[in-house]
A protein has these predicted regions:
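Gram-negative bacterial Sec-dependent N-terminal signal peptides
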Residues: 1-19
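Low-complexity, acidic/polar, glycine-enriched regions of mature
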Residues: 20-191
Length: 191
């Protein structure tokens, strides 16, 4: 009986340890759209999104640890107006021919009940790298009904100063340099 108890305890420990292992997730590009809101001379707010992004998330929800490594294709920016898209990709703003990618790399922090509340790291954008904290307002994981793997999603918010990234276009006309990031992201557990 004593041996049986030890085996049961060992099996329980092994199961717990297996569940606590970090899980890697791949960003689902068909459900991930980094969006942004930027001031237009204090008159209105312009909104746009990036249609192509990729990356990985590694997370151990029991231990409350994780990492994020995301790349955004700056040529996929879309304001909903072709002329504005062309201007934004040009020398006045993104210079996407010279700086085709934005890259966020950081750690997941502030876990509550297995859910991260922020990602703290650096954003490389337009050839400049600055610290950025992304606030995770909503986070949930489910068993994906079609892929039969865990699928996690989040709504993420942050504000950056685009002048710190070398993009002060319009400042002389009264444009605010603050850009609000609104990111919907989904990531599926790697096979």
């Amino acid at each position: 009986m004593h041996t049986l108890s030890r085996l049961a305890a060992a099996a329980l420990f092994a199961t717990s340890a297996a569940q606590a292992a970090p899980v890697s997730y791949n960003i689902d590009p068909s459900h991930t759209f980094p969006s942004f809101e930027a001031d237009h001379m204090g008159i209105s707010t312009w909104r746009g999104k990036f249609d192509r992004s990729s990356g990985t998330v590694t997370m151990d929800r029991e231990a409350g640890t994780g990492t994020v490594d995301i790349v955004v294709d700056m040529n996929s920016g879309d304001f909903g107006l072709d002329a504005l898209n062309k201007m934004a990709k040009g020398k006045e703003l993104f210079e996407s021919a010279k700086y085709p990618k934005a890259h966020f790399k950081g750690t997941l922090e502030g876990f509550t009940d297995g859910a991260p509340t922020r990602a703290v790291g650096t954003l490389e954008l337009h050839g400049k790298t600055n610290p950025v904290t992304l606030d995770i307002k909503k986070f949930k994981c489910i068993q994906h009904p079609m892929f039969k793997r865990e699928d996690c999603g989040a709504d993420i918010y942050a504000t950056i100063d685009r002048e710190q990234f070398g993009m002060p276009a319009g400042k002389e006309y009264g444009f605010s340099m603050a850009v609000d990031l609104r990111i919907q992201v989904e990531a599926i557990a790697a096979k």
